[in-house]
Amino acid sequence: TGKRDDSVENYRIHRQKQEGLYYVEYHPAGGDANVEHLLAALDYAVTLDQVEARIAPDQALFFINLTADEARKIAEITDDSAENDFRRSVSCVGSTICQIGMQDSNGLLKDIFAHLEKKGVDTRKLPRLHISGCPHSCGTHQIGEIGFHGAVKLVDKKPMVAFILVDGGSEHMGSENFGKMAGNIVATKIPEFLESLANILNESPEPDFGTWRLTHKGDYMNLIKAFE
């Protein structure tokens, strides 16, 4: 057991129930870990007393039973971890690997990240996305505040790669809810849709998407329709 030092706590490092111990979350954006960083963290972890690395179902890895100094070191090694909830968005592997996947869910997530980075959009108010390549639950789209699952959309009588937008899901205890279909958007328009949503959120006083949606659901539905 280490000495308690709560100055170490931040969005990735948190205190455990055991006095003086901390855990570190490593959530690489899109679930794609930097192999060198991950191996370096694991190589360091095996030299420590009773420290474990546990894989989470949302593409994150947790290093547990760390002292404050050890937690700082692990966080430093894995500094490519997602910096906010939006960057912690999850997707299944998608159609490039999955034999029954309809669309490339992981590719969509990467396209979204790349587009918003290129545009210099502040993503701190956007929620975590949950993206599945098909109606199955591998990307847990049903529980996302914003979820997507792979689909097809006819545009000028031609089938286009698209994703069904699922609205209002929740995994939080006491407010558990499966989201409902709110639109069908061609995949190439989704990054621009999220750019527009982020710009609206950043101009609003509400602290995050969930709070904004409570009083602006009509505006949100209109935005979805504008991109359908």
Regions found by a protein language model. Give the residues of each.
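Intrinsic, low-complexity N-terminal interaction/targeting segments
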Residues: D6-N10
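Short glycine-/aliphatic-rich beta-strand segments at the starts of folded cytosolic domains
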Residues: Y11-D32
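Short acidic (Asp/Glu) and glycine-rich catalytic loops that position anionic groups and cofactors
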Residues: Q18-Y22, R54-P57, F86-G94, D167-G179
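Generic alpha-helical secondary-structure signal
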Residues: I74-I77, F193-S196, W212
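Mobile "lid/hinge" segments at catalytic clefts and subdomain interfaces of large enzymes
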Residues: G147-E206
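Radical SAM enzyme core and accessory elements
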Residues: L201-E203, F209-E228
